[in-house]
Amino acid sequence: MCGRTACSLGAARLRRACAYRDRQGRRQQPEWLREGRYRPSYNKGPQSSGPVLLSRKHVQQDADSSERVLMDMRWGLVPSWFKEDDPSKMQFKTSNCRSDTMLSKSSYKGPLLKGKRCVVLADGFYEWQQRGGGKQPYFIYFPQNKKHPAEEEEDSDEEWRGWRLLTMAGIFDCWEPPKGGEPLYTYTIITVDASEDVSFIHHRMPAILDGDEAIEKWLDFAEVPTREAMKLIRPAENIAFHPVSTFVNSVRNDTPECLVPIELGVPKEVKATASSKAMLGWLKSSQEGSPQKKEDTLPRWKSQFIHSPSPKKSSAGILRQWLGQEGGPPAKKQKA
């Protein structure tokens, strides 16, 4: 399953990170719709809003279906046929949608057959491993290149070389209040059986679209029929992960500390270190619109971590570089 994500890039950088090639081979950046509503977060849960990619044709009928737009939508699908005047009155959870049942449930089948496919964007997602009497959170994401995001210029037209966003297959819908009012756009994340590498953490994972060709096929509902698009919904192998502090357990905690790699089996006190202060300084200067915390309000906590076998994949060292955490514990070399 997928019940918590992080998406910390500011709106302008998020747009750059989603650049793609159009049918003529030209680099394009998707236009933001309702950009002012987007709020970056290191700890995003269901019912919060998050960024998604969709075909422009959904909002502009005469548009080319291969064109993409960015929109901020609420996490947890509210079907267009929902009759209550308050979407919070829904009595079932729709933050995740199982791939094996989505064509048998009306909440998902309707929008899916209408081509309402979207790509949910995130730095990565959190998943909890249940072991013994406790749960150990992990952060799961795409393997990263070694270029530091701080080198990226905000208004650069060059290819994005910062953090590679995790791109998850989703379904969206638009609900209109029965008594009138602003339409509500919502989404759900499709889940599949976990790949072998992450099955020790949880038996389910998001359906991850690896590469622009997969993203293009999933979004272009006018050219790629549902049956063909469904072939993209499968477990992903090209992923990395590392354990993180139980600080992330509370959705109220929304700082970079949520992402920082930890070593299992080691009691660790996390506080406002010099490196974390430098990290926050970089985030303030380079990520417009990102969550900002005063240095003296950084959390301080102690956790006893459950010992478990080391993960098979990790880009933890690169994440520390991204967060300015070079002073943290060294990442162990692990099999790819």
From Swiss-Prot:
SUPFAM superfamilies: BB1717-like. Belongs to the SOS response-associated peptidase family. The keyword S-adenosyl-L-methionine does not apply. The N-terminal catalytic Cys-2 residue forms a thiazolidine linkage to a ring-opened DNA abasic site. Glu-127 catalyzes reversal of the thiazolidine linkage; self-reversal is favoured by duplex DNA formation. Glu-127 is also involved in sensing abasic sites in single-stranded DNA (ssDNA). His-202 stabilizes the abasic sites by forming a hydrogen bond with the O4' hydroxyl group. This is Abasic site processing protein HMCES. The record marks H202 as: Required to stabilize abasic sites. Coiled coil: none annotated. Pfam families: SRAP. The modification Thiazolidine linkage to a ring-opened DNA abasic site is found at C2. Residues 29-52, 283-336 are annotated as: Disordered. It comes from Gallus gallus (Chicken). Its EC number is 4.-.-.-, 3.4.-.-. GO terms for molecular function: DNA-(abasic site) binding; peptidase activity; protein-DNA covalent cross-linking activity; single-stranded DNA binding. Formation and reversal of DNA-protein cross-link depends on DNA context. Catalyzes formation of the thiazolidine linkage in presence of abasic sites in single-stranded DNA. Mediates the reversal of the thiazolidine cross-link in presence of double stranded DNA. It is found in: Chromosome. Keywords: Autocatalytic cleavage, Chromosome, Covalent protein-DNA linkage, DNA damage, DNA-binding, Hydrolase, Lyase, Protease. The active site is at C2 (nucleophile), E127. The lineage of its organism: Eukaryota, Metazoa, Chordata, Craniata, Vertebrata. PANTHER family: ABASIC SITE PROCESSING PROTEIN HMCES, DC12-RELATED. The keyword Endoplasmic reticulum does not apply. GO terms for cellular component: replication fork. Disulfide bonds: none annotated. Sensor of abasic sites in single-stranded DNA (ssDNA) required to preserve genome integrity by promoting error-free repair of abasic sites. Acts as an enzyme that recognizes and binds abasic sites in ssDNA at replication forks and chemically modifies the lesion by forming a covalent cross-link with DNA: forms a stable thiazolidine linkage between a ring-opened abasic site and the alpha-amino and sulfhydryl substituents of its N-terminal catalytic cysteine residue. The HMCES DNA-protein cross-link is then either reversed or degraded. Signal peptide: none annotated. GO terms for biological process: DNA damage response; double-strand break repair via alternative nonhomologous end joining; interstrand cross-link repair; positive regulation of isotype switching; protein-DNA covalent cross-linking repair; proteolysis; somatic hypermutation of immunoglobulin genes. Residues 29-38 have a biased composition (Basic and acidic residues). The record marks E127 as: Required for sensing abasic sites.
